[in-house]
A protein has these predicted regions:
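Helix-loop junctions on the cytosolic side of multi-pass membrane transporters
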Residues: 45-46, 50-80, 161, 273-286
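MFS-fold secondary transporters
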Residues: 63-64, 180-181, 197, 272
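Hydrophobic residues within the alpha-helical transmembrane core of Major Facilitator Superfamily
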Residues: 58, 109, 146, 179-180, ...
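Substrate-agnostic recognition of the 12-TM MFS/MFS-like secondary transporter fold
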Residues: 1-27, 103, 111-120, 144, ...
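Helix-to-loop junctions at the C-terminal end of transmembrane segments
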Residues: 26, 150-164, 248-249
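C-terminal ends and interior cores of transmembrane alpha-helices
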Residues: 172-186
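A single, central transmembrane helix in multi-pass transporters
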Residues: 13, 20, 26, 31-50, ...
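Small-residue hotspots at the loop-to-helix junctions and early N-terminal turns
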Residues: 5, 134-142, 227, 258
Length: 301
């Protein structure tokens, strides 16, 4: 859980920086001064923005090339693309059939689905409720991400792996806060509100992500598990993004679409909790054994 706290915290920090930077890059006032410098190849604002993004990606590539190899034994991978795809789907099904893996995968998938669309929701809400421009609203997206980072760090210090499922009820509260967001129309309320909502998300995702990777590592290895996790998370981002876009496309206001989005989160988290309780009732021995494995490998000194 502590390792996941660091990983998620740094990931969310990068999101904060990306959102704030993106908000500044679309500000026409910035490029008025930059274009006046007469830099070669930078004749339009889009040229400068793309050049900066390419530079950032280049720096990231250099960092990735310097990551040291570990001594962990790698599991063999099929060389043929067809066999590789079949192996992926087997791993996907295996993780969804695991009594703890399915719960943690469902929770983290939903969280990242919400997180991936949160920036668009906050932009739309800030424009409708606070009459903010895109640049101004981008700072509020950063506020949500800041809260998520804080929640991730707190969870890494307070939640043990074998108690990860205890944070799931907070998911319903997070969805309810999304619904309540439509009633917030003052900045002094919005900032702590968004920080708290982000912190809830961070507090949920770190222990559940740690539990998911623990089960994935035991079932199929870390690499395959991460591939399955990312596939499901990206699919959820697309699905929830389509839901939000379809809602606004059908004529719903930004407030109504956000409320619908939050209601979907509440219902989804309630169903995941019912699913977990069903597993506890009907697969008690298996759940207890899996929790013993988690406790044994992550027991405090």
């Amino acid at each position: 859980v502590k390792a996941n706290g660091w990983i998620e915290g740094l990931t969310i920090t990068s999101i904060i920086l990306g959102v704030v930077l993106g908000g500044q890059l679309v500000d026409a006032r910035l490029w008025t001064d930059v274009l006046a410098l007469g830099l070669p190849g930078v004749n339009k604002p889009v040229h400068g923005a793309l050049a900066l993004l390419i530079l950032i990606y280049g720096v990231a590539a250099v960092f990735n090339m310097r990551i040291p190899r570990t001594t962990a034994v790698l599991r063999p991978m099929p060389s043929h693309q067809g066999a590789l795809l079949a192996d992926f789907w087997r791993c996907n099904g295996r993780l969804w059939r695991d009594r703890l893996g399915q719960i943690s995968l469902a929770t983290t998938t939903l969280f990242w689905g919400v997180s991936g669309n949160m920036r668009y929701i906050v932009l739309a809400w800030a424009a409708a409720a606070l009459h903010y421009s895109t640049t101004q609203a981008a700072s509020l997206v950063g506020v949500v991400a800041l809260g998520t980072a804080v929640g991730a760090v707190v969870a890494s210090m307070r939640v043990r792996l074998d108690r990860a499922t205890q944070v799931m009820p907070l998911g319903i509260l997070m969805g309810a806060l999304l619904v309540a967001m439509v009633y917030v129309d003052h900045l002094w309320v919005a900032v702590p509100f968004l920080v708290f909502m982000g912190a809830l998300g961070g507090y949920i995702v770190v222990p559940m992500n740690a539990l998911l990777q623990h089960r994935g590592h035991n079932l199929m290895g870390a690499g395959r598990s991460i591939a399955v996790q990312n596939f499901n998370e990206q699919a959820c981002i697309l699905a929830l993004g389509f839901l939000y876009s379809a809602s606004t496309g059908l004529g719903l206001s930004a407030f109504a679409a956000i409320a619908l989005f939050g209601a979907v989160v509440v219902v989804s988290m309630a169903l995941i909790q019912l699913w977990y309780r069903h597993n506890l009732r009907h697969h008690t021995a298996e759940i207890k054994q899996l929790m013993r494995i988690a406790r044994g490998k992550n027991a405090p000194p």
